[in-house]
Design a protein with these regions (language model features):
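Cleavable N-terminal signal peptides of Sec/SRP-targeted secreted and luminal proteins
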Residues: 1-13
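Flexible coil/turn and secondary-structure edge motifs
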Residues: 14-241
């Protein structure tokens, strides 16, 4: 998250997405929670928040894309970004940087969201794809999708259709190793793993690939006001903010 490398932002998947989904607002009784992870969560949070606003037609107050940490077998808390005291370091607890999003439980919506996710991968050579922030290495940056039911989910076919680069979808067991250079994306059961919101100062942050507009950064205050973001994660100050 602290290193910089330049790649083009994921705009094509948004512009190529289907017309705005019907019933894209939040709060439906059947909404599902999906986690997307690949590299630093700043890029994935931006991609998915823009997907919510542009494709689902959600207002700023309805955005649900929250940055955080998930996928670890260790249930300890708090779960935090790297800090001087070494308190609750997410990667040491087996977690990866991830984004949680609430979606209507339709195959079309999940496929659209997953297509945005898969569009973020870049060619590494030898028909292998990986995260764009190639200097961020280690299990804390591994790629996974977590949805209800995991590989047994009836919606998994939507994820497979969105898999633009033909990457291998494999079962994750929690606290999994890095996926960089393997052309793999783990699939987890989101109901089996807790999502830990990242520190507020890391939410809706500029990415290492460039800056985002003020209208995007303002989402932090909007989600704090509607309590979708909580101010106290129990984490100390970190090496970013």
């Amino acid at each position: 998250m602290m290193r910089w490398v330049a790649f083009a932002p994921v705009a094509s998947a948004l512009s190529a997405a289907p017309e705005r989904e019907a019933a894209g607002g939040v709060g439906g009784a059947g909404d599902i929670t999906v986690f997307f992870a690949s590299g630093c969560f700043w890029g994935r949070q931006h991609d998915l928040a823009e997907f919510e606003r542009q494709t689902l037609g959600r207002a700023d107050s309805e955005v649900t894309a929250i940055g955080g940490y998930a996928g670890g077998a260790d249930s300890s808390s708090p779960v935090c970004y790297y800090n001087q005291g070494g308190v609750g370091i997410y990667s040491k607890l087996g977690h990866a940087e991830a984004v949680s999003i609430r979606l209507p439980p339709t195959a079309a919506t999940l496929e659209s969201a997953a297509r945005v996710f898969f569009s973020s991968f870049v060619p590494l050579g030898n028909r292998t794809f990986g995260r764009e922030d190639v200097f961020d290495q280690g299990p804390g940056y591994r790629a996974f999708i977590a949805l209800p039911g995991g590989l047994a989910s009836p919606l998994l076919s939507a994820v497979r259709r969105a898999n633009l680069h033909g990457m291998s979808l494999v079962a994750g067991n929690g606290s999994d190793p890095d996926t960089f250079g393997t052309n793999r994306v783990y699939v987890l059961d989101s109901s089996a793993y807790t999502f830990h919101q990242a520190e507020v100062c890391l939410q809706f942050h500029n990415n290492q690939t460039g800056d985002y507009p003020p209208s995007y950064h303002r989402l932090r205050e909007v989600l704090l006001a509607n309590k979708r973001l909580r101010n106290d994660t129990g984490c100390p100050g970190n090496f970013v903010c």
